[in-house]
Amino acid sequence: MDNNETSVDSKSINNFETKTIHGSKSMDSGIYLDSSYKMDYPEMGLCIIINNKNFHKSTGMSARNGTDVDAANLRETFMALKYEVRNKNDLTREEIMELMDSVSKEDHSKRSSFVCVILSHGDEGVIFGTNGPVDLKKLTSFFRGDYCRSLTGKPKLFIIQACRGTELDCGIETDSGTDDDMACQKIPVEADFLYAYSTAPGYYSWRNSRDGSWFIQSLCAMLKLYAHKLEFMHILTRVNRKVATEFESFSLDATFHAKKQIPCIVSMLTKELYFYH
């Protein structure tokens, strides 16, 4: 398949009490909390890129043509941001889980953050290893604050290029133009995660066989332009706009022709994130 069509990344407590911490300052006071993540550790951190292109015949899933363009683009982009980039190709579901477990057990104490990019087929709540599905929640749980202590309080970014269902977006016409004194603070184990999904829940995610996926193209372009100027959520907003306004599917199948896409950002970050300091 090299006819420059766009493709999709899918598979063919009852009682409780509240506790008040007396004498504590309001989170809005700014007295105890810095407004942005500390990004001046000796290393920016790891960037793991899982690039699944070829799938076992038994899965019935097609090759993801164009994904190597995404992987190369991501590698260049995050290396420019001083991340240690590790590319992994065509991993089974077992290999993905083993990789995440292994990486989470590394010493990240000298690293400012962690990034994991997954390029694969997907469905809602799962991404696919080359031999079958992986529950995304299980995959990311290795990096929770109670499991990966050396990343506690640091930003953990998961970037997912995969379908989240089989709905199609036809579009609509528009007429409108951590410091030492914080060492004892307790934080939720799910804090400081950000999930950047290529598409909204339930929808297809589009990929071009020549240029790569719309989302990864846009993410890399916006990071190259703004990583040294803007906060990360502001960058992602620009990614959303670029995907939403500059791309439309082309397919010989009328069902899949002239469709749109909007990325979806789920943030549990507790501070602003800048890739510079």
Curated annotation (Swiss-Prot):
Q: What class of enzyme is it?
A: hydrolase
* Coiled-coil stretches noted in the UniProt entry, renumbered to this chain: none
Point out residues bearing the modification N-acetylmethionine: 1
Record Pfam families: Peptidase_C14
- Report the EC code(s) recorded for this entry: 3.4.22.56
- Residues that the record marks as modified (S-nitrosocysteine) are 163
How is activity regulated here?
Inhibited by BIRC6; following inhibition of BIRC6-caspase binding by DIABLO/SMAC, BIRC6 is subjected to caspase cleavage, leading to an increase in active caspases.
Reaction(s) catalysed (UniProt annotation): Strict requirement for an Asp residue at positions P1 and P4. It has a preferred cleavage sequence of Asp-Xaa-Xaa-Asp-|- with a hydrophobic amino-acid residue at P2 and a hydrophilic amino-acid residue at P3, although Val or Ala are also accepted at this position
Propeptide per record: which residue ranges? 1-9, 10-28
Cited SUPFAM superfamilies: Caspase-like
Q: Which residues carry this modification: Phosphoserine?
A: 26
Biological process terms in GO annotation: anterior neural tube closure; apoptotic process; axonal fasciculation; B cell homeostasis; cell fate commitment; cellular response to staurosporine; DNA damage response; epithelial cell apoptotic process
Provide the protein's localization: Cytoplasm
Q: Major location, coarse class?
A: cytoplasm
Which GO MF terms are attached to this record? Answer: aspartic-type endopeptidase activity; cyclin-dependent protein serine/threonine kinase inhibitor activity; cysteine-type endopeptidase activity; cysteine-type peptidase activity; death receptor binding; endopeptidase activity; enzyme activator activity; peptidase activity
Check the record and name the Gene3D superfamilies matching this protein.
3.40.50.1460
The active site is formed by 121, 163
Modification after translation: Cleavage by granzyme B, caspase-6, caspase-8 and caspase-10 generates the two active subunits. Additional processing of the propeptides is likely due to the autocatalytic activity of the activated protease. Active heterodimers between the small subunit of caspase-7 protease and the large subunit of caspase-3 also occur and vice versa. S-nitrosylated on its catalytic site cysteine in unstimulated cell lines and denitrosylated upon activation of the Fas apoptotic pathway, associated with an increase in intracellular caspase activity. Fas therefore activates caspase-3 not only by inducing the cleavage of the caspase zymogen to its active subunits, but also by stimulating the denitrosylation of its active site thiol.
GO cellular component assignments: cytoplasm; cytosol; death-inducing signaling complex; glutamatergic synapse; neuronal cell body; nucleus; postsynaptic density
Q: Per UniProt, which keywords does this protein have?
A: Acetylation, Apoptosis, Cytoplasm, Hydrolase, Phosphoprotein, Protease, S-nitrosylation, Thiol protease, Ubl conjugation, Zymogen
On tissue specificity, the annotation reads: Expressed in heart, brain, liver, and muscle but not in kidney or testis.
Q: Which residues carry this modification: N6-acetyllysine?
A: 11
Could you say which protein family the record assigns here? Belongs to the peptidase C14A family.
Described function: Involved in the activation cascade of caspases responsible for apoptosis execution. At the onset of apoptosis, it proteolytically cleaves poly(ADP-ribose) polymerase PARP1 at a '216-Asp-|-Gly-217' bond. Cleaves and activates sterol regulatory element binding proteins (SREBPs) between the basic helix-loop-helix leucine zipper domain and the membrane attachment domain. Cleaves and activates caspase-6, -7 and -9 (CASP6, CASP7 and CASP9, respectively). Cleaves and inactivates interleukin-18 (IL18). Triggers cell adhesion in sympathetic neurons through RET cleavage.
> Subunit composition?
Heterotetramer that consists of two anti-parallel arranged heterodimers, each one formed by a 17 kDa (p17) and a 12 kDa (p12) subunit. Interacts with BIRC6/bruce.
Name of the protein described by the UniProt record: Caspase-3
